[in-house]
Amino acid sequence: MTRYAFGDTDLARERLGLVAETFREPTARLLADVPPGVRRYVLDLGCGPGYTTALLLDAFGPGYVTGIDSSSAMLAEARMRVPAAFFVVADVTTPLKLPAHVVFSRMLLGHLPEPERALVRWANAVLPGGALVCEEPVRYRSTRKVFERYEATVTEVVAAQGATLWAGPALDSDPPRCHRAIDRIAEHAVAAGRAAAMFWRNATTWRGAPDLIAELQDLERANPDETVVWEIRQTCWIKR
């Protein structure tokens, strides 16, 4: 089972809460733009503590939304957060056993080896007329040197797991029997202090980064009047 590079500690859960709040708007817009159709059975891959699962319930209404994650601790929190959904411990790098009208992932491929193969496996679980929906970062733009240092460090951490941090290009290839309905770059501005808050919580899972953590914490407290701009690739395929 693929190990998540950033762990499932209390700080990791705090970071995921910040990520959920920070990127809620672009994700909600993407889900609203998914072409209409039968959307009764929905899978949320790498659901963590259930933030994206709640968005899927909001977007597709009553039905059967199932969150899948490798961490039982994360899923315990997800069950409390989204009692209307179902949750299953499973490895998203293996074939999915639940067919669905919608298969969704956000910022997950960057943690997986061979992301293109993962897309093919996920598409195999999509029912005809259903949608495979993915969001992956392409890059972020900032003039802050500390953010450049963070990016270099996290790129190495993810690469050590056999994965690629900026997984947006993995969405270039079309899974078999799928055609693109959406393919766009969403730009999303985030306050520099909020970006620093997410980043230092990540950095605590690595050894040997105390100076980087301290500088990011100082930046969170200072909360300067500037932004970091994420470029997020949003793609939706419809299964033939």
Which residues does each PLM region occupy?
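A short acidic, Gly/Pro-enriched loop at the edge of an enzyme's catalytic core
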Residues: 94-103
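A short glycine-rich, Lys/Arg-flanked "PGG" loop and its adjoining helix->strand segment in the class I
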Residues: 116-128
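C-terminal helical/coil "lid" or tail adjacent to the Rossmann-like core of SAM-dependent
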Residues: 3-5, 11-12, 23, 177-228
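Core SAM-dependent methyltransferase catalytic element
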Residues: 232-240
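Class I SAM-dependent methyltransferase SAM/SAH-binding core
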Residues: 41-43, 49-95
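Conserved alpha-helix/loop element of class I SAM-dependent methyltransferases that forms part
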Residues: 21-41, 55
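Conserved catalytic/acceptor-binding region of the Class I
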Residues: 131-193, 205-209
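Residues lining the SAM
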Residues: 105-110, 135
